[in-house]
Amino acid sequence: MRIPSISKLVFYWIPAAAMLVGYPFIGYDIIAGGFEIHGDQLISMQFLEGTYLYIIHHLLSFIPVFFFGIVLNWFDYRNAVWKELLVPLVMMALIFIAWDILFTALGVWRFNPAYIQGVSIINLPWEEVCWFFIIPFCSLFVYQIVKIRWSNPWGSARTLQFVLLVVLFGMYLLNMDRIYSATSLSMTISMIGLSLIVNWKGFGLFIASFLLLLIPMGLFNGMLTGLLTKEALVQYNSAEFGGIRILSFPIEDIGFGFGFLIGILLLSDFIKHRLSADYTLTK
């Protein structure tokens, strides 16, 4: 990983990312209402109908990873969490919690009171705040498995990065009138662009692990969007996303998760290399 100068980040990447993310908001009014209450239900699971749905979701995702990854330290995940991932995970979680707070306040999405406990932290259900720490912790276990088992598939995958940038930017231009679509795409574009700037060698590894991660994502995200319940826990404003769902969740959620996870890994590598460089300079 090449460590970019602060000036390069300040004068190039940060303004470009800010423009991509912020431009759709200029002079744009969120269309109120129009929430999609029902998801595309695949099967009804009665035990999920109630205010403990989000808690059940967290327990089902967290307990296996905690047991195998932390208690048994499979694939050296315990060391990876404490030494490399914990600090960047918390930092990125705070950024995405702010995004969640903003979009909830704007009416881009809302939370069904029938499936949450009713206790809020900064206008978010406390279960939602926990999501930003539990789910990346679980998701990065998949990344760690691929990292150990499959030695960096596709390398830096620069060609794939450029192709994704072109395709996603075209989609961004077509969806600038939908706030969630535009923001999800712009966040993904910004993170891929940053991985190019820093010449991150782990992009291919991340893509391989993210593709595998889409399998459990379908189930666990589906639990929150009406795949297994009569109504969705997270209800989206139909005017602010493209209307395409995978199982029961909007395709934009993939960009949300992509940006969140790759941001953690980029920040982790940046901190590791910056500390290493500082240590070398002071020896």
Regions found by a protein language model. Give the residues of each.
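Aromatic-rich, lipid-facing transmembrane alpha helices and their immediate juxtamembrane interface loops
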Residues: 2-283
